[in-house]
Amino acid sequence: MDELKKLAGVYAAGFVEDGMVVGLGTGSTAYFFVEEIGRRIKEEGLSVVGVTTSTQTTKQAEGLGIPLKSVDDIDSIDVTVDGADEVDPQLNGIKGGGGALLMEKIVATPTKKYIWVVDESKMVDQLGAFKLPVEVVQYGADRLYLDFESKGYKPSFRVTEQGDRFVTDMKNFIIDLDLGKINNPVALGDELKAMTGVVEHGLFNGMVNKVIVAGKDGVKIVEVKD
């Protein structure tokens, strides 16, 4: 599996050129993309500026010598490469398995070319088998949990290995919704966004331009159909 992830991540780095501002994703597949950018800076003299999507990626990028800027200090991002937990045929996706969905969406928004790197197991006919993360403010989180429960969304607070509630980089909680199937990702996204106390959700609808899929037969690119 790691070999497939590496294949996708390294392939995606081919879209990065000198002088670009590059969004650096979070997660096990994006990790290989960031590593490859670091290698190209060191070995090929690639000149880029990175914008990170989590403290985890910031540490990785700093260790590789990738120059970084805050998303607040740039006008736009040329290309962002990130992973995804599930991707449907319309290229809507679920992200946030690593807990970085808010920062990932903030970086994706000013991005000109937004690319996901996945292994073929992430491509699904319908979203929802992977639990949908919802980032919520800590104050009132238990009330939101009950709201989700009453809607039949099978919520659970994400917890650490120690059993404490997981806290995101932005100091929020995550409630994972076990929905089974999501029939209308756009409508659900709108519904969740309208709930007071919800900061962001892990549905990335209509945001990605292309998905690089690594499988046993190599790499294929899936693009949004016009």
Curated annotation (Swiss-Prot):
Its EC number is 5.3.1.6. One of its GO terms (molecular function) is ribose-5-phosphate isomerase activity. The active site is at E104. CDD domains: RPI_A. It holds the Pfam family Rib_5-P_isom_A. GO terms for biological process: pentose-phosphate shunt, non-oxidative branch. It is an enzyme of class 5 (isomerase). Pathway: Carbohydrate degradation; pentose phosphate pathway; D-ribose 5-phosphate from D-ribulose 5-phosphate (non-oxidative stage): step 1/1. It comes from the Bacteria. Catalyzes the reversible conversion of ribose-5-phosphate to ribulose 5-phosphate. Homodimer. HAMAP family: Rib_5P_isom_A (MF_00170). Belongs to the ribose 5-phosphate isomerase family. This is Ribose-5-phosphate isomerase A. It comes from Streptococcus thermophilus (strain ATCC BAA-250 / LMG 18311). The gene is rpiA.
